[in-house]
Amino acid sequence: MQKSMYDLTTPQKLIWYTEEVYKGTPIENITGTVTIPEKVDFTLLEKAINVFVERNDSFRLKFSTRNNQIKQYIEDFSSFYVDIVDINSDKELKEFEEKVVTTVFDVFNSFLYNFIMFRFPDGHGGFIINMHHLISDAWSAGLGASEIIKIYTRLIKNEHIDDITYPTYIDYINSEQEYFQSEKFNKDKSFWNSLFKSVPDVSTIPSSIDNKSNLPCCSNRVQFTMPNKVLNEINNLCKSNRFSIFNFFMSVFAIYIGKVSRLDEFVVGTPVLNRCNIKEKHTSGMFVSTVPLKMELGGNIQFAELASTVSSKFFNIFKHQKYPYLSLLKDLRSKDKSIPNLYNILISYQNIRSTAQVSETPYEINWVPNKYIADNIDIHIYDMNDTGNINIAYDYQTSRYSKQDIIDIHNRILNIINQVLQNVNIGINDVEIVTHKEKDKILHNFNNTKLDYPKDKTIVELFEEQVQKTPNNIAVVFGTEKLTYKELNEKANSLANYLKNKGVVIDDVIGIFLDKSLESIIAILSILKCGATYLPIDINYPNTRIDFMLKDSKCKFILSSANLKDKLKKHHNVIFIDLSNDTLYTYSKNNLNITMSDDPCAYIMYTSGSTGNPKGVMVSNKNVVRLVKNTNFIEFKENERILQTGSIVFDACTFEIWGALLNGFELYIIKKQDLLDPVLLEKYLVDNKITILWLTAPLFNQLCESNPSMFKSVRVLLTGGDVLSPRHINSVKKACPNLTIINGYGPTENTTFSTCFTIDKFYDNSIPIGYPIANSTCYVVSPTLNLLPVGVPGELLVGGDRS
């Protein structure tokens, strides 16, 4: 007789899609161990299992294709043997469970369940049930366990079991088809489409893992039991404020997810029973569906208000839970095809065994995770055995998270809970997610960067000390021109004395309008020797920008050259000084020994600004000295040769120029045409034995594309100014295994580098910006300036030496 064929229900379709994506894995297995803590009659237990399967048609569902469509039918019952295995210890049982749960079902034309009984030496034992999600959900699994125990109990007592019957899953299949044609369906559709008129960004919980090389759906579980004291306080809080345990935990997790995702609005998936009446609650089969819960955290609402809002949202969602999530996605994608899955974090609350308290035969259910999940992280809040204890289990993709990540997440959740218990009306913005231990680590370990350096000396003092130490060593090289430390000092002194005679006084601002050259270095030193501040101006800046910078900084003089004078004609109020005039260098060559303020401004550098006009950043002598003297981000060796790659208008030159001249090294200034040509640059690096250079990330990428091995002769390469490309970094690391590559990050306001990271391995996704450099601080904070944990993205607060 031909079997009646049925369409898959919507919950089954969702399972089928997941099965197709992760074919050959046990991702849709539901496995539970039912243990009876007394001597078991395994013959009667086997019979009870048979009776249950015979009277529940959902267990006998089989699946096949008809005209390229997946269909299901009910197979006739025939009694079956249930294997029994002897187990000697709980450890051995756990190992056996792991073996059972990873068994992959053949979903076509075969039964999608498997029962195995187990027996301990003292005669107690139970059974393991492994089912495919196509024929069952967690509610059905719990229902099945309790009903099998119920039948077993009657058999033990020699009572009749003829009156034990169960509703058919076919009724649900038919009722769903009726629902699709009903007015209720249209109302539900309208509700969900209205709710998601705007689709929030997908939230995510950051992790420490960069190299996501494992199969994406492989997972592990970490499980915690809430401390009794804390749980009692939570129960009391929920009762007095009239919200449920689940709403409490959902609100706590929402705060955490929102803060680490930097989202005020996002979606969390949460499973619902999708059983709309008593009959369906007593029917085995796949009913459960996942609904998207839209969380809104804006406006610094209080926790009590959030929990109340979540409660109201759930109330409305439950009224419309029958509308399929797949249908909602289809609706949304009909308007915007780019809409992804609405969530990748799932939070569930389960208290399945409501019938356990009335069972005459004691038993306990232990659910076994199958170690595969489709979402990034599934969070289960549950009390499976009605113990009154709340457990939180985190199933997490091992390609994304480490076990320590999950432990850290849970500790932060406990921290949020403690704050809420102290003040249920705490504002969301005031909730801190970092634990006390994490805060201590960030404040006193991560930011313990204090190192001794000559902070009470100016750039000029340190440079002149270096001149005394190595007067005849080469200081700076440009093309075929070079100057020793003594020659550079004397030229700078002559120019400084000239400037002093022209009326330059301490704290004046002096512009430098020069291309890269020896003269630019002489100019910088001469201005500093006057106790003045230098203002670098790019020769290619438009007149409007130059005019703004000169007026904004109150610049009085510009050091330049005759060939550039025409570009400055309109700036009449500024005195032009031509450095190509040899008479400027006939003044005294002696040090000026000018007494300066405690920490004079060294230079003003204009950045693009955020208001349309450039923004002038004043950088003190102390900031420069902190950057290059006795620092921790780079180890200087003897006889370094540092390449100046950028114009003096970019703050990387602060490291290049003063990293060389305040440490007795040689500064090499490269011409632009040589820098941008990979062949010429490689030749320059080799011929001049350059040991250290800085490149902006875009230029580094461009050069790498041409020849990743061009840096073989270099000892240290610093790069940054933009997000680094792992592909290009990895390429150079492979080609130049002896090269040290440092990711240098920092705003101009904090003097070139705030953080640095020595790239010691290959990265697939993002490269860290590292740690604060010596005598600096670095804090990652939320938009409301709450401290964030290490590894969580946020706003970066940086600071220098406050001593």
Which residues make up each language-model segment?
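Generic preference for hydrophobic
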Residues: 72, 84, 115, 268, ...
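Motif- and composition-driven signal specific to adenylation
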Residues: 335, 518-526, 530-551, 563, ...
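Adenylate-forming
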Residues: 3, 13-22, 31-39, 49-51, ...
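A short secondary-structure junction motif
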Residues: 199-203, 631
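Short, highly charged C-terminal tails/helix-capping segments
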Residues: 429-441
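Short acidic/polar active-site loop segments enriched in Thr and Asp
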Residues: 244, 264-266, 505, 556, ...
